[in-house]
């Protein structure tokens, strides 16, 4: 997680400990949901923090942007903050890049939350909201995909085993070794996808 993410958790916790006496500006930085804290929206893209803010304000859920793979120390801060909010079970919805690395980050976040040192596997469920080609249709038009897709075969040969494994599951884009950055998606579509997912949990 990024430094800003940890600060948001820490400021939120300090606000709770001091009976909410910190300034409103800092209380608003807390990322733990005010109404449905156990519902967690996750993205790897720090540039989608605006979407996290939308999810939190519109739906009262917990929302975080990790800036890539999340470390166990940051996960511990996050877990502690959720436990202080009396969360015992967690449902996670993830929006990440449509590529091997986005899929891995989403999967690892869900798995880590289910570790026995945190909530335990039986208390965590999660889904990637843009894991398949069919999912992409909710985020992009065909023209946007064509413009935004990138050739994954151009990456280092050391990453090609990851590409092959991911391609075997997803079939890439139209049967080609392509991925796409999720933050290229239209903002309204991203908001609607969060709205759609929240209604299902």
Question: Where are these predicted regions, by residue range?
Answer:
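Nucleic-acid enzyme cleavage-core boundary/entry regions
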Residues: 1-90, 103-201
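Catalytic metal-binding/acid-base residues of hydrolase active sites
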Residues: 99
């Amino acid at each position: 997680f990024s430094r800003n993410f940890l600060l948001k958790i820490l400021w939120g916790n300090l606000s709770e400990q001091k009976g909410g006496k910190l300034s409103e500006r800092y209380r608003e930085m807390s990322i733990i949901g005010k109404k449905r804290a156990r519902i967690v929206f996750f993205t790897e893209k720090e540039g989608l923090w605006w979407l996290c803010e939308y999810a939190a304000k519109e739906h009262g859920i917990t929302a975080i942007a990790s800036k890539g793979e999340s470390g166990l120390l940051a996960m511990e801060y996050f877990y502690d903050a959720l436990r202080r909010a009396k969360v015992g079970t967690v449902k996670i919805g993830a929006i990440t890049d449509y590529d091997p690395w986005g899929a891995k980050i989403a999967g690892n976040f869900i798995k880590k939350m289910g570790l026995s040192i945190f909530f335990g596997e039986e208390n965590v469920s999660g889904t990637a909201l843009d894991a398949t080609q069919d999912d992409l249709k909710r985020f992009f038009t065909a023209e946007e995909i064509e413009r935004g897709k990138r050739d994954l075969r151009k990456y280092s040969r050391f990453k090609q085993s990851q590409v092959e494994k991911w391609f075997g599951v997803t079939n890439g884009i139209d049967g080609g070794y392509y991925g796409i950055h999720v933050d290229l998606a239209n903002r309204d579509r991203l908001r609607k996808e969060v709205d759609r997912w929240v209604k299902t949990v």
